[in-house]
Amino acid sequence: MEHILDCRMGWDPADLAYVSSRIVNGDLVVLPTDTVYGIGVRADNHDSVRALLAAKGRNETMPPPVLLASVEQAYEVSTDLSTDAIRLMESFWPGALTVIVQANPSVDWDLGQTGGTVALRMPAHEAVCELLSSVGPMAVTSANLTGQPPATNVEEARGYFSGTVDCYVDSGPTKSGVPSTIIDCAHGDATLLREGAWALKDIATVLGYQPGTR
């Protein structure tokens, strides 16, 4: 039986408790973000992360990013935040910027072949940040099968994951549908990996130099 919980007007406490319990128990959950809908699990649940990758049709060479409830959490999951990473987080979070940083080895996450890094983002979505505060960091990737367009509403997500996921958080259609910009700050100077909601010039303005591209 599918459970669709509406958070458009904020969380009903019982709904937040229910979704939180499902996530803590290791279940896959579809949830909104400020860009597109995502499918996610607790970042520290190894079996759930593997189930997430399988649901997407991915393997461990494509590790999911991690959503955080605050900038402060980034200091807990990374041992070495560069000046560039801090500037970007403080300027664009909460928002549609994913920042790749060196991972803290003591954090017991197995997200796949990360090369000792982790991709972090704090979404500009109050209800989702409240959920993240409840359950902790989540490994979340776009709600679609690999190679297909990402879902921008619950119905599209159900089309991809009906039978695999039975818990959906609905906040209506996403506002932009444009994925986050991805910046690698784990290997020296910042490098743009994907231009999305934020343009390269926006990043350069904050950093004071033009990032490389890859």
Where are the regions a protein language model picked out?
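Active-site-adjacent structural elements in enzyme catalytic cores
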Residues: 1-214
